[in-house]
């Protein structure tokens, strides 16, 4: 009997010890600092502002810099992280801040094309002023004659990261790609061979400096010039599928705005005459409706990041402006004075 009582006492002690252990390790609202009782805040980044309308964040984006500002406008969190590390950690960036309401800001970059393509926070200390989280193309002259590393932006106001209990809370910050590749192809319809040196290409704009909210900051104009220019033979845009001589120029430009008026200009270097001078935005938007999606002009410009233009010239390098091709769509021009 004494042996049985001893076993029961031992069992009761073990049971009590287990109950106390569970109580100590449980997450109580009154013991926020206990080990194992955590409130974890995380941010997931999304890049579906593209023409495929799907999230491809982990593919083109390589590094992310996240800033978090509290309701007083103070910078309380700042971290730069490789996207490969974010993906390895489950696809999230962890925030080491208290649960509250924050404004989240992101500058992100893709695969490096040109080292130090941008200068960030050029207008002053952003510790107490999110408006100073600007981004400017790194340049010493008006002309940009090199490729630019892809630039992305994210900005979410009044993000609710409050938590009433322990656990994990995740919010999403969508990104917009700012940089665009513009490829200009000039084909000769007469059979005359074209040389890359026959033409001078440029795009004049004033979008080299962007504010914290991705809007343009008043700045000197900027001229984008080709980082690649070459000649060769291409398939003619006709039913005969013949090969014709062509010159190709590739330029990378910063964010395009529906309210601005950049100009794409091409000159004949043999005589200095202008081949054409067209409004880039107006021409880019000519094919927006062909994608069968409801988009504002600005949304289309933000989703589309690859613009391919094909122009035709005669044997004197004069522009044959009856029609052009934009992103493989044939466009019959009614007004070449746009």
Description of each model-found segment:
Residues 33-51, 174-187:
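A short, Gly/Thr-enriched small/hydrophobic beta-strand-prone motif that recurs across taxa
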Residues 253-338:
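Hydrophilic extracytoplasmic domains
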Residues 77-177:
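Short, low-hydrophobicity acidic/polar segments
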Residues 142-241:
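A sequence/structural signal for flexible, mid-protein segments enriched
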Residues 64-118, 195-291:
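Tryptophan-paired
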Residues 2-16:
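Bacterial N-terminal signal peptides that target proteins for export
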């Amino acid at each position: 009997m004494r042996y049985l009582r001893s076993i029961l006492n031992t069992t009761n002690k073990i049971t009590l010890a287990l109950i106390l252990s569970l109580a100590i390790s449980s997450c109580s609202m009154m013991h926020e600092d206990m080990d194992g009782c955590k409130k974890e805040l995380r941010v997931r980044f999304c890049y579906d502002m593209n023409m495929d309308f799907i999230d491809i964040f982990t593919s083109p984006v390589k590094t992310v810099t996240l800033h978090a500002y509290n309701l007083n406008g103070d910078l309380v969190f700042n971290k730069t992280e490789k996207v490969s590390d974010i993906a390895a950690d489950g696809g999230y960036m962890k925030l080491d801040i208290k649960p509250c309401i924050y404004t989240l800001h992101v500058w992100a970059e893709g695969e490096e094309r040109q080292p130090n393509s941008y200068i960030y926070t050029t207008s002053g200390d952003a510790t107490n002023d999110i408006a100073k989280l600007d981004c400017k193309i790194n340049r010493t002259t008006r002309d940009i004659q090199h490729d630019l590393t892809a630039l992305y932006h994210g900005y979410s106001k009044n993000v609710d990261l409050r938590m009433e209990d322990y656990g994990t809370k995740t919010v999403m910050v969508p990104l917009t790609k700012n940089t665009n590749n513009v490829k200009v192809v000039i084909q000769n319809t007469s059979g005359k061979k074209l040389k890359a040196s026959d033409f001078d290409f440029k795009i004049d704009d004033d979008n080299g400096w962007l504010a914290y909210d991705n809007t343009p900051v008043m700045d000197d104009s900027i001229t984008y010039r080709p980082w690649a220019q070459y000649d060769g033979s291409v398939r003619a845009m006709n039913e005969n599928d013949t090969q014709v001589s062509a010159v190709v120029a590739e330029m990378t430009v910063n964010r395009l705005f529906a309210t601005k008026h950049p100009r794409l200009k091409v000159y004949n270097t043999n005589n200095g005459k202008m081949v054409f001078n067209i409004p880039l935005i107006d021409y880019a938007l000519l094919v927006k409706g062909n994608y069968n999606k409801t988009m504002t002009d600005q949304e289309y410009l933000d989703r589309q990041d690859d613009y391919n233009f094909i122009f035709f010239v005669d044997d004197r390098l004069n522009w044959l402006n009856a029609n052009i091709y934009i992103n493989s769509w044939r466009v019959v021009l009614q007004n070449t004075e746009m």
